[in-house]
């Protein structure tokens, strides 16, 4: 990666590295068979969890541990990290092996999410905990302003399962009905079947988990109107 590309990414991250080799390592996937980002990812995961937990603790002094845990899970989950990675166009800067490049690894959600954690680890090693905390909070500013402890933090599948259990009904059944598209741009179709609804509910997403969550969300809405 040339210095112009590094400069453009640093502007997006709003952080300038003293040791740019750390940023390059954070962007290097293990498929390249060189010094890759997995150790930085491990470090960044722990730092992100601490920073968000600390912020929630001070923002919401009346909220119990369970609700804070659910809010933190929402903020640090893979979907959120992938969104942040796409805001920074991280895929354009990733260093990948040929196999990953050919299969669209630069846009694979798990790789994008992992790279954000690795960048957090790299910033910490390049600076200190106060600096990386400020950087994370800049990235998360809107999300922290918008998160509401009174809203459902549990995912739709969990809420649907709890709904069925509270009504003493069998648990939902999820069937993978179809997978279409290229490896880097697949669409999964899930059918959800529950007692109380005659028809199957269809959910779609870029991976099986997302498709199941969409199906669960639609099922909950249907059950509420039955």
UniProtKB/Swiss-Prot annotation:
Annotated GO biological processes are: mRNA processing; regulation of gene expression; rRNA processing; tRNA processing
* SMART domains membership: DSRM (SM00358), RIBOc (SM00535)
UniProt cross-references to HAMAP family, sorted A to Z: RNase_III (MF_00104)
Q: Which reaction does it catalyse?
A: Endonucleolytic cleavage to 5'-phosphomonoester
Q: Which cofactor does it need?
A: Mg(2+)
- Per the record, the major location class is cytoplasm
Q: Where is the DRBM domain?
A: 155-225
Which Enzyme Commission number(s) are listed? 3.1.26.3
* Family designation: Belongs to the ribonuclease III family.
PANTHER family noted in UniProt:
RIBONUCLEASE 3, RIBONUCLEASE III
Q: Which Pfam families match?
A: dsrm, Ribonucleas_3_3
Q: What is the protein name stated in its UniProt record?
A: Ribonuclease 3
Give compartment(s): Cytoplasm
> How does this chain assemble?
Homodimer.
Keyword set, alphabetical order: Cytoplasm, Endonuclease, Hydrolase, Magnesium, Metal-binding, mRNA processing, Nuclease, RNA-binding, rRNA processing, rRNA-binding, tRNA processing
Q: Start and end of every RNase III domain?
A: 6-128
Keyword Thylakoid applies: no
This protein's GO cellular component annotations are: cytoplasm
């Amino acid at each position: 990666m040339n210095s112009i590309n590094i400069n453009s990414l640093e502007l997006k991250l709003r952080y300038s590295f003293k040791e740019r080799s750390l940023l390059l390592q954070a962007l290097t996937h293990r498929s390249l068979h060189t010094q890759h980002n997995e150790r930085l990812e491990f470090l960044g995961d722990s730092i992100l969890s601490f920073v968000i937990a600390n912020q929630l603790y001070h923002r919401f002094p009346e909220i119990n541990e369970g609700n804070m845990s659910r809010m933190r899970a929402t903020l640090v989950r893979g979907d959120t990290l992938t969104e942040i990675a796409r805001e920074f166009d991280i895929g354009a800067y990733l260093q990948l092996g040929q196999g990953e490049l050919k299969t669209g690894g630069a846009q694979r959600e798990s790789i994008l999410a992992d790279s954000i954690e690795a960048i957090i680890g790299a910033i910490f090693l390049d600076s200190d905990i106060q600096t990386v905390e400020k950087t994370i909070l800049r990235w998360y500013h809107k999300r922290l302003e918008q998160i509401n402890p009174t809203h459902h933090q549990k995912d739709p599948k969990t809420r649907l399962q709890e709904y069925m259990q509270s009504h003493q009904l069998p648990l939902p059944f999820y069937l993978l009905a179809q997978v279409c598209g290229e490896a880097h741009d697949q669409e999964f179709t899930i059918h959800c079947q529950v007692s109380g609804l005659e028809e199957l509910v269809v959910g779609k997403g870029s991976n099986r988990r997302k498709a199941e969550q969409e199906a669960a969300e639609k099922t909950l809405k249907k059950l509420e109107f039955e």
